């Protein structure tokens, strides 16, 4: 069974959106990726409307089973946090109207799931997203790569109900993060 996840890296100026199909063996394939941009010159209500309209279109077009949204975290710039929170609210409401579950993931969770380290930088995340999805070129801008990383993270952490890679923890077809995750899950199963 394939799980379709729509990942959203919320932002008021740039909102990354990515759709990924993930198989039970954790093989992930990009379906679509994009960024919804709004101008700071526009009023807040119009900016949120642009994001809401785009999210509605993506939900209708790609019919994801779940949304993975980056959890808002505290930053020094309050206006940035507010914009991210407002964009997140629009996205979550769009999913709720359709009865689509929403999962929130912290940036550290996403980095750890994709790269194996919760303190990785954006370049490392983009590089591994490109490898995991077998893309010819890295998704740009970083908001697009982050949206795909969110979708991958959700599917690998909670989504598919699968027991990790059928190719086994030592497989060379897995990234270091996938191998570490597979080994941890295998160890947890043995401990039961």
Curated annotation (Swiss-Prot):
Main location: cytoplasm
EC numbers for this chain: 3.1.21.10
Subcellular location: Cytoplasm
Family note: Belongs to the RuvC family.
The protein, known as: Crossover junction endodeoxyribonuclease RuvC
Binding residues annotated for Mg(2+) 1, in chain numbering: 9, 143
Gene Ontology cellular component terms for the protein in this record: cytoplasm; Holliday junction resolvase complex
Active site, UniProt feature: 9, 70, 143
GO biological process, one term: DNA recombination
Disulfide-linked positions: none
